[in-house]
From Swiss-Prot:
This is Type-1 fimbrial protein, A chain. It is found in: Fimbrium. SUPFAM superfamilies: Bacterial adhesins. Keywords: Disulfide bond, Fimbrium, Signal. Belongs to the fimbrial protein family. InterPro entries: Adhesion_dom_fimbrial (IPR000259), Adhesion_dom_fimbrial_sf (IPR036937), Adhesion_dom_sf (IPR008966), Bact_Fimbrial_Adh_Pro (IPR050263). The gene is fimA. The lineage of its organism: Bacteria, Pseudomonadati, Pseudomonadota, Gammaproteobacteria, Enterobacterales. Fimbriae (also called pili), polar filaments radiating from the surface of the bacterium to a length of 0.5-1.5 micrometers and numbering 100-300 per cell, enable bacteria to colonize the epithelium of specific host organs.
Length: 184
């Protein structure tokens, strides 16, 4: 009896495994998504590093007490624009210009903050300073101090800081600027 039961169990298991082996093994293909490839081929002395093209500078949290009156600034935070594959037989100097919306006509060197659904800070914007500490006009035509290029990789340092146009109120304090590089 035990042998008969064992034989039935073994035969049942074998029939199940053969059924699974005969199951449909046709592969299934589904749409996955889109991959975007972005870049640019340039005829210039250098190529802007991909990490510099679309970067975020973290200015962090700053107390309203630090920005309580017009002209007050936060501590500056450094950031860089890296140039790769530079060829000094093409150009020996580089400078950068930033373009963004100024907070108002009396402050052309202060970026306006973006609107935020959660509420934006007021009476404050963002300044960009070049390696010499000069505040840059955000018109896309006023360039930073020139940097002498070396063959290969070059780094152009900048700083950003909050600038109060009055007593700052709390809220999100984000701003955007684009940049372009001029080679000479």
């Amino acid at each position: 009896m035990k042998i008969k039961t064992l034989a039935i169990v073994v035969l049942s298991a074998l029939s199940l495994s053969s059924t699974a082996a005969l199951a449909d093994t046709t592969p299934t293909t589904v749409n996955g998504g889109t991959v975007h490839f972005k870049g640019e081929v340039v005829n210039a002395a250098c190529a802007v590093d991909a990490g510099s093209v679309d970067q975020t500078v973290q200015l962090g949290q700053v107390r309203t007490a630090t920005l309580k009156q017009a002209g007050a600034t936060s501590s500056a935070v450094g950031f860089n624009i890296q140039l790769n594959d530079c060829d000094t037989t093409v150009a020996t100097k580089a400078a950068v210009a930033f373009l963004g919306t100024a907070i108002d006509s009396t402050h052309p060197k202060v970026l306006a903050l973006q609107s935020s659904a959660a509420g934006s800070a007021t009476n404050v914007g963002v300044q960009i300073l070049d390696r010499t500490g000069n505040e840059l006009t955000l018109d896309g035509a006023t360039f930073s101090a020139e940097t002498t290029l070396n063959n290969g990789t070059n780094t152009i340092p900048f700083q950003a800081r909050y600038f109060a146009t009055g007593a700052a109120t709390p809220g999100a304090a984000n701003a955007d600027a684009t940049f372009k590089v001029q080679y000479q």
